[in-house]
Amino acid sequence: MKFPILLPNIFNHPFTYESDLDLKVGDYVVVPFGKSKITGVVWDEFEKKNNKDFKLKTIFKKLNVTPLKKTTIKFLNWFAEYNIIPKGMALKLVLLSSNAVEISQKDVFKIFKTKITTNTIKLSDEQQKSLRKMNISNEQFRVHVLQGTTGSGKTIVYFSALKEIIKKGFQGLILLPEIGLTSQFEKKFLEFFGIVPAIWHSGISKKRKEIIWSGVANGEIKVVIGARSSLFLPFKKMGLIIVDEEHDQSYKQDEGITYNARDMAISRASFENIPINLITAVPSIETYENIQKGKYSISRLEQRYKNASLPNYEIINLNETKLEKQSWLSKKIIDKVNSHLDKNDQVLFFLNRRGFSPHVLCSKCFNNYSCPNCSINLVWRERGAPLGPTVTRACLHAPCACRPSWGVGGHD
């Protein structure tokens, strides 16, 4: 019998093989390809017919792995077409190092025990209202946005939603924008659920990834917390996707296969016919537009959890504040910093990008240092050093008449 086998490579079509094995769509198999052996998946359609008569090769074996779901296959077909990549490259995102993992010993999954412990955390009335609006009991596709200020308890709300999903035997995925957030987030998860989640990102060892991949495929692992790539894990019974900090630009992958993980998560939820929650303090423009059109539902947390007070802050308008000579900090800021330093307190300055100054002005004539070719502001990097070029050698700037020592510049 003939079978269409999609391989994790640059081809946009499956290859036809023959076998006497009892195979169905989604089964993982090992096949000959050239002079090597490669893992592929029985796909849902054959390659386009041609007039050439090829001698078909025989499938070596069927792997003892839970088959890839038909809904996942449909998602990968759509993903490849939408992002203009070969279907084989889309499949490569699912397979671990271009292979499926056979793990027969179930004791390796003991660290990811599924028995949830009872916690004493109680939701506020506002949080309970948001949880009800999520409507997770309705196991159908819908996008819900949970918006709340920092410290409003958004995490506890969607943890509660996820808890109900796990109790029903489903699996959940929590997407985070940055790898650095996973370790801190893991502690919160352990405190709430009493179980260890599977952490997935590029920094995880190959052996650990093999265990997680297999555990997700056979349903032993119930919750995965990960970066963009975790979206392509072969979940056996996915029930809920949560995208934390949905507005974060880190969800966009710009190297290799380019895609927006937030948007692809919404699409995967649609193919799986499951709910997805977007968590944010400030919705992205795309999300806001969909809320306005009524495509996404939304609930808001206006108060901080347990009525915690907001930090005191003050905006200092530099247009109305006279600065000291040779200084770009107002006297009020300097006095505040000095008062804390006198008390042996610590002071932290947040800069919105690398470099000492992303916007360099001449303090005498207020000339703005920018690239003459692209108008991007030049960045001051080292104290006493020129504005070092970092992107293009074409960014040469004539020195300011007031500061002849400032010459060559560059931008980020």
Annotated model-derived regions:
Residues 194, 247, 320-323, 376:
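A broad detector of the eukaryotic-type serine/threonine protein kinase catalytic domain
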Residues 268, 275-277, 284-290, 295-363:
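Conserved interdomain linker/interface between the two RecA-like ATPase lobes of SF2 helicase motors
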Residues 113-114, 244-248, 312-317, 378, ...:
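Gly-rich Lys/Arg/Thr-decorated short loops/hinges at beta-loop-alpha junctions or inter-strand turns
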Residues 328, 333-334, 341-384, 388-391, ...:
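Cys/His-rich short segments
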